[in-house]
Amino acid sequence: MKEEFINNRPVSMKAAVYHGIGDVRLEERPVPVIRDPKDAIVRVVRSTICTSDLHIRNGAVPRAVPGIILGHEFVGEVVETGSEVVKLSAGMRVAANCETFCGTCFYCKRGFVNNCEHGGWELGCRIDGCQAEYVRVPYADMGLTPIPASVTYEQALFTGDILSSGFWGAEIANINQGDCVAVIGAGPVGLCAAGSAKYLGAGTVVIIDRDEFRLRLAEKNRLADVTVLNGVQDAENTVRELTEGRGADAVIEAAGGKDTFELAWKLARPNAVVSIVAMYEEAQILPLPSMYGKNLIFKTGGVDAASCPRLLSLIEKGELRTDFLITHRSPLSQIMEGYRVFGAKEDNCVKWVITDGSRQ
């Protein structure tokens, strides 16, 4: 069958589509078109499978719309822009922010772009995402950032989601020079949080996880000064020994496990900040009577939707890097195998990258 083209683009494309709990399929979909003058169409060069995609598949994100194309973490090349897009043009290499924001509403004007009245987590949740050959990006001037010439697609790939999330988690933890910072979870966000904590001045970073491979990955890339194999080693005792019995000056919870929220506040010293960037599939309990007297500050939130330009600059300068997270690659045609392997954490899979596109 002869492939049809309009404006030098195919009419249809392959895409990973969410059809309901436990039901994700690779199927044929129309190539997206401009719907609003603030839109851009991007050819996807690299995309990933994220833990948030697994949460959608597992039914833990009720606002996700059945029938949408999954995916929100990608880089690519702009192929078309709407008439009101002024910062972008066809041919630009761009990194995408996983959050959609308008830049003009009540919250955006105050810098709280994650709470945009016209956006939020839209791509791959409420509207079609990037696990496809092309994607439409609303408010493109806000949601797409040009990639510096010296930065590769794969170096920039995680800027708009897991690096932004990890950096946000570290930044809201109020880390002071020389602090002991405990990071729970050596998954992609946790590893990014650890690297960000180092950049922000942490003196000792302790990473806690049940996966020995991921802990070794943290050590190899100098993200951790101390690692704790949870369930085998005692995280609370380790942190106390490092801090003269006080506890961590800041804790970043990036695991989202059944017992990791409790571990987070137990690791923290009195008057510490506990930063929660994990996404939980079950409700958590805040046992105030047990915590009374610790005077803890809890801060929560996901990706910082305004940080992409800053993070790309830090990547360009060599201050932060994330390319070591890529353990598996495949074309889009094999994405269902990616969901299986990434979801089961088989073969030491940290990030599965979809490599459709001609350049790195």
For the regions a language model picked out, list residue spans one by one.
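Short N-terminal strand-loop motif that marks the start
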Residues: 1-75, 133-135, 139, 230, ...
